[in-house]
Amino acid sequence: MLFSSLLVSTLVSVATAANQEVEAIQFSNLGFSGTYNQVEKLSNIYKDSCSCEVNKTPVSFSGTNAPLNEEVSVHFRGPLVLNKFASYVSDGFKYGDDSSGDWKRLSYYEGSSGTSENVTFLTSAGKNSSCLGIGLTYAGTDGISKADSSTVLAKNTLINSNDEFVIFSNISCGKSGYNNDCGVYRSDIPAYHGFYGTTKMFLFEFQMPNETHTSTDISNYNMPAIWLLNAHIPRTAQYSMNVNCSCWRSGCGEFDIFEVMNSTEYLHMYSTIHDYQGSDDIQTGMAAPAYIERDLTGTMSGGVAFDSSGNAVVWVSNSTSFDSTIQASSVNSWVKQAGADVATTLATVTGQSATTTSKKSGGVSYQPSFITNLLMTVLTLWVI
């Protein structure tokens, strides 16, 4: 790899601790040139001989926000109530520039009215495979049970710890195949396209109440999250131990928007990028050195915007609206009104090599890299 820059800085304080509370997080210089391994074949998926093969030629990517410029699915883990969701695209939005491109809404869900536009709710309630794990099905109105057809999430639906559902678009995939529109996927799942766009935005109105319904022994206890995955991942295997059953480990892209990462920091929502831009440890990823406070009793509104210049901005703000068209100035004002924020500039990377076999799992605490700690120490001493 070639690292031409690595800088961690704050917009409000020079000496920023890893546990600083903020209401907006910015990643700059997002996107790099690299490759990932795409699944080419799934064999005997419900037998002990289940296996997966990747194509011998890795998929190449480059450009602004890559590989997160590809289609993504939107994932939710409890304890969580989703009130509203919307996805947007823009021709040229640039963070901080009020005259840049406006946002056009492509998808919308509102629980109170039962509105559902270009969204499909899926959940892991399908058949179990020894190498792929549990397959996707349509989600019932409770978000976690199996349904026979596409169903809208019911108003005020609470999912508990370790329960998950995912939102795709309502555009069905064509036939499974390496060179087809959705690539290879499990033949018995409802397969849909994710949300496209280099310049895209996702908005959420949600609650993350304290867990009161499940045992503390359960995985991901009281650790809610909202995150994005390259849409190829859940269509094959989201939680497989076989490196060839998903493109995740080879770096096709994950963005954790709001994630409680361990039960001791259950009030802290972190934002993390999991690919190989500036890190060779995809499980730990590149986390912003700050957190957004989780509100246990109220409703939170916010989102993430990927702009046309390689900035990804995460925020919470009560001013967030879900209009069919949103001006650039509105998004900029939401972030500005959020108050204290932190910025992380990612390394410029070329010649990415994916060799790790680690897997994302719950309960991983954010640990700053050696370089980040060194920079923070130097900056703190400079201030003193």
From Swiss-Prot:
Induction: Expression is induced by fluconazole and repressed by CAP2/HAP43. The keyword RNA-binding does not apply. One of its GO terms (biological process) is cell wall organization. It is a lipid-anchor; GPI-anchor. GO terms for molecular function: hydrolase activity, acting on glycosyl bonds. Probable circularly permuted 1,3-beta-glucanase involved in cell wall modification through beta-1,3-glucan network alterations such as increased branching or remodeling. One of its GO terms (cellular component) is fungal-type cell wall. Belongs to the PGA52 family. It comes from Candida albicans (strain SC5314 / ATCC MYA-2876) (Yeast). A motif (ExDxxE motif) lies at residues 254-259. It is an enzyme of class 3 (hydrolase). The gene is PGA52. It is found in: Cell membrane. Keywords: Cell membrane, Cell wall biogenesis/degradation, Glycoprotein, Glycosidase, GPI-anchor, Hydrolase, Lipoprotein, Membrane, Signal. This is Probable circularly permuted 1,3-beta-glucanase PGA52. Residues 362-384 form a propeptide. Its EC number is 3.2.1.39. Pfam families: YJL171C_Tos1_C, YJL171C_Tos1_N. It catalyses: Hydrolysis of (1->3)-beta-D-glucosidic linkages in (1->3)-beta-D-glucans.
